[in-house]
């Protein structure tokens, strides 16, 4: 039972993101450094209102750079009532900016200047400047409290801009210096503004008001909105229920802009979109609400007109009717084909299908046109094709895309080479270390040490500081969020004992990338928890395996003909798990072990069977699993009873309990206080079963074994509520919905996993403690629902990121109705962020024993 080779966890999160992405820009992953710290923004594109000296010029205002005198410093002290000093960055093209990082002037310990606050002004064309405001109208952002730390601030809402000015703010006269970085990505939509009627208010039957205005629109707002961008381009799609929102601390209806039918005299809402250049449009995607029970539906048809530069609107429109949906109230993206029409402006008329129409996002799929075409359809005689030799369309976006594609190809080739090289050496090592079994099925194991490393060394060689990529990728921690590498490098801290006993995906030391010499955070790997027969595998550290390898294990051979197969419990890639009845098992079991069955009665057993066509690696893994299972001797752990290995298929025979697994057992029962005549379970019985689970896990942790899939589905129930921990719940189709599958290979029980297991691939006894807390929660809810049943798999991973950041936004499982405060307090202690602050299984077991005696 050892870990199977892993894939980078980043691929999981990227797959989740790519699989669910609907918008052109996803703010959760659009968090790349744009080139201040890496040097990709040239000095001439960094300007300032003034400078103290040549050594504190604007070009020295780069995050993590110590060049010059260590930062940009304005000529005079900043006054609270005279905010005229600024640092300006020209990004050359429009960018979607989601995050700002700032530092003061450290200068090797000689600098003390920093900006405690700042404002942001931005422009898309260099002439009209806009003051950034958050969702509540506040303009001032928190800055630094010392000259050396990097302070990262999310822009909520994000901005679309080419020019950005950072304006230092103080509450008293003081000298300030700044080093900055902007984070985001290229704005591929090319949209520079949209004009639309102002959103309206929806009054619920109870009198509550839902504000459906575009609250972050950065243009002029009156009865209509002109020359700006806002919520329709912020990359955030609204929920099915428009009264709910993704965002924190905002009002109901924030995600949507909505209009009432009676406000439109012609039965439609007209929105005009202006773009940065003439573009070739493929599709338009509109995210609409369809909560028809409240009179909200998607539009029934749309007509779009096109215009190139300053010409008139073309008479030929794109018309697209829709089939209305009165069955599914889910919000959805509506894709409108635009038939490769060319234009720099589009005017669309969205026709009402009901009382209300609500949009949360509008995106366009397009490419920059390589020549000026009127955009009319070829068959239209009313709009002849023209060509203006004086017009040159800037194709910088195209060059950037080509460069990115070439870079991606080289990266993929490098990854393939690394994977092949790793597999080659893995096979060589396996051949060198694998031993053959003797006639008594003796297995000797010596596994390489598995540990996690976090490179906090900031020094780097000159060769390591060279970077040719335009952007250094900040890998996502969840589908909707990622932290820049400069920040998260400091965060994970684990006690030495946990690192020694942990079983994790091997985390490679981070390699510095970029002139700043700051190492990227070490990438975690996906750990495949499945064994060859489909069940989860225990994680056994190298120290423990070295102790086991010195002992010969003789396992009794069981006559295969005595196995009476009843049903298949589950299956894996190379084997199956069957429920069988056997007679005469007493002759083959250990003398110190008593079967939980009456004399001369058939015994229920679980038989793990390896298929005859399994490869050599699978056979060795199966035999290693027998080696480990044979050492587990505890009243609350499933025992290995016998094996069948004289011929194929190889089998191992383990205990099974007459009441099946705890999940099914509890779901068939009700609390004792219930008035129902159905089977009941008392609170004392629940506590008794939980205590046994803790006892079994205490035994495993004493051996430094990590279960990695502790849940009620992996706890078997015998007579008198006895519990034994098993390991084949993962193989059962019945519980396939409890696991998230990645690329058809690894399956992860993410709803039971700790944040460090999901994000760092790290499995320790502390991560088993987390899973025990979830198992305890299942027990006291009588397994009536899945943990976090209200969240999708992507949202569960998103919540994991909240545990990582620890900003008070994480969602905990609620206290079950039958659960006393003392037990729920125990659950919460199992879900503490820091692994060293979680209780041990010895402490948990003792606490449950004490509570049971009260």
Curated annotation (Swiss-Prot):
The active site is at residue 709. Present in an inactive state in the absence of collagen binding and phosphorylation by SRC. Tyrosine phosphorylation enhances the affinity for ATP and the catalytic activity. Widely expressed. Detected in lung, ovary, skin and in testis Leydig cells (at protein level). Widely expressed. Detected at high levels in heart, lung, skeletal muscle, central nervous system (CNS) and kidney, and at lower levels in brain and testis. Detected in chondrocytes in tibia growth plates of young mice. The gene is Ddr2. This is Discoidin domain-containing receptor 2. It comes from Mus musculus (Mouse). It is found in: Cell membrane. N-glycosylated. Belongs to the protein kinase superfamily. Tyr protein kinase family. Insulin receptor subfamily.
